[in-house]
C-alpha cells in the first residue's frame, strides 16, 4: 500500500523508457537504410481516422480538444503501419506541446498531385531559429524541458516520409502554435 502512489509515476517512466528504446532502434535502422516498407495501396483517410481515435483519450486527459473532420480516401502507395507511425508522432507531439484548453486540428486535402495531412496545434510554437533543426536527431526546443521526449520522433517521422517519396513541412509561430504537414504523392486512379 505504501508504494501505491508511486505506481503511476513508475508506469509513466517505464512507458517512456520503452518508447526511447523503440525509437533508438528504429532510428539506427533508418540511419543504416535497413527499414523495409510493406507497400500497398493505402487510404490516408483511414490512417488519419485510426491515429486520431488512438490519440483522442490522451488529448482529452490533458484537456486538449482534438478535431478531425472525416477525411476523404486519399489513396497513396506506402506502408500503412509506417504511415500511422508518422501521423502518430506528429499528433503526439502536438498533444505534448499544446496546453490544457488548447486545440489540435487534423485536416487533409489534395494539392498539385499530392496528398497533404496537416496537424495544427495551438501550442507554444517553435522559435524561427529552432525551426531548421526540429527534424535533427535528439533536438529539443527551448520550451521542451518539461516534456518527456526522446528527441527522435520528428526525425523518424521525416525519414519515414522520405522513404515514401514525401516530406514533412513546418509552419510555426511562437505563442500561436505549429502546423506540421505530411506531403505524399497521391496515387493516380
Which residues does each PLM region occupy?
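Short alpha-helical segment of the dimerization/phosphotransfer core of two-component systems
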Residues: 12-17
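Short helix N-cap motif at coil->helix boundaries in the Bergerat
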Residues: 44, 125-133
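Bergerat-fold ATP-binding/catalytic subdomain of histidine kinases
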Residues: 30, 133-144
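Conserved catalytic submotifs in the C-terminal HATPase_c
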Residues: 38-43, 60, 65-74
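Short helix-loop "hinge" at the ATP-lid/N-box region of the Bergerat-fold HATPase_c
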Residues: 94-95
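Conserved glycine-rich
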Residues: 165-166
Amino acid at each position: 500500500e505504501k508504494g501505491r502512489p508511486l505506481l503511476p509515476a513508475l508506469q509513466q517512466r517505464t512507458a517512456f523508457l520503452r518508447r526511447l528504446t523503440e525509437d533508438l532502434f528504429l532510428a539506427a535502422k533508418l540511419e543504416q537504410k535497413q527499414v523495409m516498407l510493406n507497400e500497398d495501396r493505402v487510404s490516408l483517410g483511414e490512417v488519419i481516422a485510426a491515429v486520431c481515435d488512438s490519440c483522442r483519450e490522451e488529448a482529452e486527459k490533458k484537456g486538449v480538444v482534438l478535431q478531425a473532420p472525416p477525411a476523404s480516401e486519399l489513396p497513396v502507395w506506402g506502408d500503412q503501419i509506417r504511415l500511422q507511425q508518422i501521423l502518430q508522432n506528429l499528433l503526439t507531439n502536438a498533444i505534448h506541446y499544446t496546453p490544457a484548453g488548447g486545440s489540435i486540428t487534423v485536416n487533409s486535402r489534395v494539392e498539385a498531385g499530392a496528398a497533404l495531412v496537416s496537424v495544427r496545434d495551438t501550442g507554444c510554437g517553435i522559435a524561427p531559429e529552432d525551426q531548421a533543426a526540429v527534424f535533427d536527431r535528439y533536438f529539443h526546443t527551448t520550451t521542451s524541458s518539461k516534456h518527456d521526449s526522446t528527441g527522435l520522433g520528428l526525425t523518424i517521422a521525416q525519414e519515414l516520409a522520405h522513404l515514401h517519396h514525401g516530406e514533412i513541412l513546418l509552419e510555426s509561430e511562437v505563442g500561436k502554435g505549429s502546423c506540421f504537414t505530411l506531403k505524399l504523392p497521391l496515387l493516380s486512379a
